[in-house]
UniProtKB/Swiss-Prot annotation:
It is found in: Nucleus; Cytoplasm, Cytosol. This is Pancreas/duodenum homeobox protein 1. A motif (Antp-type hexapeptide) lies at residues 118-123. Residues 247-256 have a biased composition (Low complexity). GO terms for biological process: animal organ regeneration; cell differentiation; cell population proliferation; cellular response to acadesine; digestive tract development; DNA-templated transcription; endocrine pancreas development; enteroendocrine cell differentiation. Activates insulin and somatostatin gene transcription. Key regulator of islet peptide hormone expression but also responsible for the development of the pancreas, most probably by determining maturation and differentiation of common pancreatic precursor cells in the developing gut. As part of a PDX1:PBX1b:MEIS2b complex in pancreatic acinar cells is involved in the transcriptional activation of the ELA1 enhancer; the complex binds to the enhancer B element and cooperates with the transcription factor 1 complex (PTF1) bound to the enhancer A element. Binds the DNA sequence 5'-CC[CT]TAATGGG-3'. The modification Phosphothreonine is found at residue 151. Residues 146-205 bind DNA. It comes from Rattus norvegicus. It comes from the Eukaryota. Belongs to the Antp homeobox family. IPF1/XlHbox-8 subfamily. Transmembrane segments: none annotated.
């Protein structure tokens, strides 16, 4: 009986693992119904080294953590069978460690979560950051590496591209592959270059059209003035209309009649200071 009493007294030092959980503890009865344990015999006495482990349990157990204690099992033998399925925990040299015994594991858990995120795309908000998340299986890209670098074309590459654009404003897929191999570029580089070059060409064409429309509107007035002057000179050079009888006055020269009178001369008959000769009378 001494060994059994020592065993029952030692179980009071054991702290239930549920005691380390935070929050209110529901009220429950520690005494199970007697029908569950009828016919069961009490466990055998512990081995001799159990006394040494009790001292270790008493020294290493955290003080005043559990909100309640297991009631003494000596008064109720049925409650002693609650822990008969945990013989290994009673024989441990140290008590079961709590989730955060000394407050040191909390900081250790928070620091890795700040450094290593479960998904790399959750850390960066810049564009094109997904390219470097699988490099080497680890996400160690700097913010500077996420920026897209501008492609620098050489003179030989630009010359070949300009020559191709001179003949074809839109490049086909086979020709694009051929140029990519010849110029040591990617198809994407050539495609983007042709897109930018077409936009530049369209802007130049629009500028030429707008400048041509402005110059054409200003120069269109001069031909109208020339036409007006020319038409006036032609009107002055034209001979006067013939009389209704069809007879042409004798004072009008033949050049005026044919319409070949110079512009400085008038087609109207000029009064002559010489008196007309009288017709000679027949003798």
């Amino acid at each position: 009986m001494n060994s059994e009493e020592q065993y029952y007294a030692a179980t009071q030092l054991y702290k239930d693992p549920c005691a380390f959980q935070r929050g209110p503890v529901p009220e429950f009865s520690a005494n199970p119904p007697a029908c569950l344990y009828m016919g069961r015999q009490p466990p055998p006495p512990p081995p001799p080294q159990f006394a040494g482990s009790l001292g270790t349990l008493e020294q290493g157990s955290p003080p005043d953590i559990s909100p309640y204690e297991v009631p003494p099992l000596a008064d109720d033998p049925a409650g002693a069978h609650l822990h008969h399925h945990l013989p290994a925990q009673l024989g441990l040299a140290h008590p079961p460690p709590g989730p955060f015994p000394n407050g040191t594991e909390t900081g250790g858990l928070e620091e890795p979560s700040r450094v290593h995120l479960p998904f790399p795309w959750m850390k960066s908000t810049k564009a094109h950051a997904w390219k470097s998340q699988w490099a080497g299986g680890a996400y160690a890209a700097e913010p500077e590496e996420n920026k897209r670098t501008r492609t620098a074309y050489t003179r030989a590459q630009l010359l070949e591209l300009e020559k191709e654009f001179l003949f074809n404003k839109y490049i086909s897929r086979p020709r694009r592959v051929e140029l990519a191999v010849m110029l040591n570029l990617t198809e994407r580089h050539i495609k983007i270059w042709f897109q930018n070059r077409r936009m530049k060409w369209k802007k130049e064409e629009d500028k030429k059209r707008s400048s041509g429309t402005t110059s054409g509107g200003g120069g269109g007035e001069e031909p109208e003035q020339d036409c007006a002057v020319t038409s006036g000179e032609e009107l002055l050079a034209l001979p006067p209309p013939p009389p209704p009888g069809g007879a042409v006055p004798s004072g009008v020269p033949a050049a005026a009649r044919e319409g070949r009178l110079p512009s400085g001369l008038s087609a109207s008959p000029q009064p002559s200071s010489i008196a007309p000769l009288r017709p000679q009378e027949p003798r």
